Amino acid sequence: LEAFFDYTIKDEGNNPVPFKTIAASGINATTLHYSSNNSLINDNDLILFDLGCKYDNYCADISRTFPINGKFSKLQKTIYEIVLKANKQICKIAKANMTIRQLQEICIDILATGCLNASLIKDKKEISKYYFHSVSHSIGLDTHDPFIKDTPLPVNAVISNEPGLYFKEYGIGIRIEDDLLIKENHAINLSSKIIKEIKDIEKFMERNKD
């Protein structure tokens, strides 16, 4: 799958991918930067893609997670919806003069509350076992452009929006990542055309299962 994506990007005339494509299924998706991409995909697995391309030397960094058999299980759906809620909320509130640290604190609270309500954790502090990276980083000429997390975001900065949850005990790793263009009072989702709603993913998988 990694090779197919990389080939497609180059075949479309784009520059080489800006970082090694991640195509992680099952428990491998609970490893943040898994890149071996050499395991067999089991029927009930989710597969997590973290991938990108370059355009005029600027990087894109996108993640999507979907069920390889086309249907989310009940538990997969529960965890996915928690991550999706965080992703949507960060997109909704991100704007100039906020800091990445502020976005991270909001993201952690949403994920912790969701997991607590779903009985996936017993205390909000446990969220650190299942979410252990930043919700955002600066994107530009490099996939991770240098940026201080306490620095107010300027207008026209581009940042990632990538909440995730990783449960090794269930073999479930989910990350949903978009690229946001920061404006004065809002953010523009540059990757909004890439589907991420459960109903859209399942519909797409059903339509293309052959």
What do the PLM-derived regions correspond to, one by one?
Residues 1-210:
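Active-site neighborhoods and metal-handling regions in enzymes and metal-associated proteins
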